[in-house]
UniProtKB/Swiss-Prot annotation:
Cofactor: [4Fe-4S] cluster
Enzyme superclass (EC): lyase
Note on cofactor: Binds 1 [4Fe-4S] cluster per subunit. The cluster is coordinated with 3 cysteines and an exchangeable S-adenosyl-L-methionine.
Similarity remark: Belongs to the ThiC family.
UniProt-annotated binding residues for Zn(2+): 271, 335
An example Gene Ontology biological process: thiamine biosynthetic process
Binding residues annotated for substrate, in chain numbering: 67, 96, 126, 165, 187-189, 228-231, 267, 294
EC annotation from Swiss-Prot or TrEMBL: 4.1.99.17
Keywords in alphabetical order: 4Fe-4S, Iron, Iron-sulfur, Lyase, Metal-binding, S-adenosyl-L-methionine, Thiamine biosynthesis, Zinc
Protein name listed in UniProt: Phosphomethylpyrimidine synthase
Length: 439
């Protein structure tokens, strides 16, 4: 029995009670959200006792994912393990292993161990393609069984959610490749599947075998994350016919997953102009009847190379404030290189800021308590309190101490002109005058 089926049957389980406790909502609210497919729980039954309770969807606090993993030109397992630990330390809710180089089974298991208790996601088509490339000399020799067996292997390992690019049809792939899009296909998984379909003249195996895949996910009660192969990789491609056509297919797949009793969420772009971010979220929610929306950024400009974590956090904050549920971080290395550990930290913090800013809008009673406390700490110049409440206490302390200790209670920005010190001095003076003895 999946948690979705339990919820549909009106049963409030211990896991639902735990979600309610973590999120600060009523268990019945959680049950109704799960039953409607508007909330998912990111945990594979194989790891149910080892994974933190992370629920995504309507009424849940906005979650942040950190992508890590090797490339086939830079294989440093120790660095990826360090990235997993950094993502966990600085507050990511989940980690995805996107490795494409090295022994992918070993790497996935090491990252899973390092990231625990965070849920782990993967994109199994990467391993299916790379393993066949290693064995046979070219990834396009992979068969449908290679893909399905890789998915099953990841499920058996305890992977909690997987991106499946099932909505990229053969027809859409052929049209996109010949289109005048700025960037026809920017999804790695999508490009692999497009090349495979065009080479073999067959339909997308993730789509043609979708019912079988649903049965596999149902057994482990893991979550399918429906990938968007034709997401816009440039602002000018946002919401074009290819992007929206794939979204329509994904909406139908959401319905099929729900009918099969499988938890499912939808992935979104990408690169979207600022004035279209809200419309993007509302459209996705409308077409999927409120499926949890997992969005990459979105980046609101294409020219922020080196600062794409900022461009993405701007879009992410707007998207989440208007209903996106799950933000996939972007690092400063986006579009330029494999991120290093420090860039992973910067990406996590940027998107935690975005998620928290959105939650203040969506759930002020739950989210704003810490901001209220921070304001009080600042008002009394309680530096230890300010640092403790910061999203990145290490960074806050580093900057606070960057010129060494100050001789006064304020900081070096204002010195003796600190607004709080000035007002405090004035108040004390007035108080002394008020209580001075009469002449």
């Amino acid at each position: 029995m999946t948690i979705y089926k339990d919820a549909r049957n009106g049963r409030i389980t211990e896991e639902m009670k735990k979600i309610a406790e973590v999120e600060g909502v009523d268990p019945e609210f959680v049950r109704r959200g799960l039953a409607a497919g508007r909330i998912v729980l990111l945990r594979n039954l194989k790891r149910a006792d080892r994974v933190k309770t992370v629920a995504v969807g309507e009424g849940m606090l906005t979650k942040v994912n950190a992508n890590i993993g090797t490339s086939n030109t830079l294989i440093d397992v120790n660095m990826e393990v360090e990235k997993a630990k950094i993502a966990k330390k600085y507050g990511a809710d989940t980690v995805m292993d996107l490795s494409t180089g090295g022994n992918l089974d070993v790497i996935r298991r090491k990252i899973m161990e390092a990231a625990e208790p965070l849920p782990l996601g993967t994109v199994p088509i990467y391993q299916a393609f790379m393993d066949v490339a290693t064995r046979k000399g070219a990834g396009l020799y992979m068969t449908e069984d290679d893909i399905l067996n890789t998915i099953e292997k990841h499920l058996k390992d305890g992977v909690d959610f997987m991106t499946l690019h099932a909505a990229l049809t053969r027809d859409l792939a052929a049209k996109a490749v010949k289109s005048d899009r700025a960037e026809p296909i920017v999804s790695r998984g999508g490009s692999i599947l497009a090349a495979w379909m065009l080479e073999h003249g067959k339909e997308n195996p993730l789509l043609s075998n979708f019912d079988y895949i649903l049965e596999m996910f149902k057994e482990y009660d893991a979550v399918i994350s429906l990938g968007d192969s034709l997401r816009p990789g440039a602002l000018e491609d946002a919401h074009d016919e290819y992007h929206l056509s794939e979204l329509m297919v994904n909406a139908r797949l959401v319905k099929r997953a729900r009918e099969a009793g499988v938890q499912v969420m939808l992935e979104g772009p990408g690169h979207v102009p600022l004035d279209r971010v809200v419309a993007d979220v509302k459209l996705a929610k409308r077409l999927t009847e409120g499926a949890p929306y997992y969005i990459l950024g979105p980046l609101v400009t294409d020219i922020a190379a080196g600062y794409d974590h900022i461009a993405g956090a701007i879009g992410g904050a707007i998207a989440a404030a208007h209903g996106a549920d799950f933000l996939c971080y972007v690092t400063p290395a986006e579009h330029l290189n494999l991120p290093n550990p420090e860039q992973v930290r910067e990406g996590v913090i940027a998107f935690r800021i975005a998620a928290h800013a959105a939650d203040i809008v969506k759930y002020p009673d739950r989210a704003m308590k810490v901001d209220i406390e921070m304001g009080r700490c600042r008002g009394r110049l309680d530096w230890e309190c300010m640092i403790r409440l910061s999203l990145d206490p290490d960074k806050a302390r580093e900057i606070r101490n960057q010129y060494g200790p100050t001789s006064i209670k304020s900081c070096n920005m204002c010195g003796s002109l600190c607004v709080f010190l000035l007002l405090d001095k004035w108040r004390r003076k007035k108080d002394e005058e008020l209580h001075a003895p009469l002449a």
